[in-house]
Amino acid sequence: MSRRLPSTPPVLSGFTFVRVLGSGGFGDVFLYEQQLPRRNVAIKVLLPEVVNPRVRDMFQSEAQLMSQLSTHPSILSVFEAGVSSDGRPYLVTEVCVGGYGERFRAETIPVAEALRTGIRIAAALETAHRANVLHRDIKPGNILVTAYGHPVLSDFGIASSVYLGDNSTAVGLSVPWSAPEVIRESTTGSTASEIWSLGATVYSLLAGRSPFEVPGKDNSPGHLAGRILKSKPQPIGRSDVPARLEEVLNKAMSKNPIDRPHSALEFARQLQQVETSLGLPQTDRKSTRLNSSHANVSR
């Protein structure tokens, strides 16, 4: 199937269109130059054909959530949001220079980098969870890299408040990084399922594939879902990945949510311990804003 052409970039007061950055199923991302302050920004714009009251509400929810959380250094910074003159909602964010969506399959990512990224994204999740917010779509493709080389969590498009969320409402999911209970539709998400997804994401950065992909086998969503429910993750298969790190990731991907780390903070600390055991500098907790307090978030 051929990819669709990007939509027409909207005319926005105070912004000058530069070029297309990317396209997705629901919208496009464009590079604009903002006039005041003068800087380049990324503007995510919904496609006109998908805009309806429900989608508009979800998009506004994403804007609100990200504006509240984006003061965290590992969450994509949001500058403003609005509706264009032709009725398309848009979100203005910082520009990122890369991400892990394609890179994890194309390159061998160093262990130290995978650990740093896992710790920083765990810190972002901890902040979201304390605000009673679940992301619901943690995967390599939703981790971007800023111009300063820092990983940031993006795309809270299907996130929701834990207390306001409706567990009976189905949401989109990325099967390779979805926890067993989400696959079974026992829940649309929880702190425990987010830890599973983050463990699966760190695994993917190291292995170059998602945890239940089997080289040479049928890795369609249906077969992956079956393995997620019944099988153990494939070994990472790298001699430079210590056994302790595989143990930490397998624990995070336990079938039973109770057996996983009890918070993103606990998972981050386990990754930090692996850093220490490898003689690596421990990722600075101050830069990730981790501490020992916990929000009362549903598991």
Kindly give the residue locations of the regions a language model identified.
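Activation segment signature within eukaryotic-like protein kinase domains
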Residues: 117-118
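Conserved short submotifs of the Hanks-type protein kinase catalytic core
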Residues: 86-99, 103
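Protein kinase glycine-rich loop
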Residues: 18-24, 29
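Conserved HRD-motif arginine in the catalytic loop of eukaryotic-like protein kinases
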Residues: 260
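Protein kinase catalytic-loop region centered on the HRD/HxD motif
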Residues: 121-133
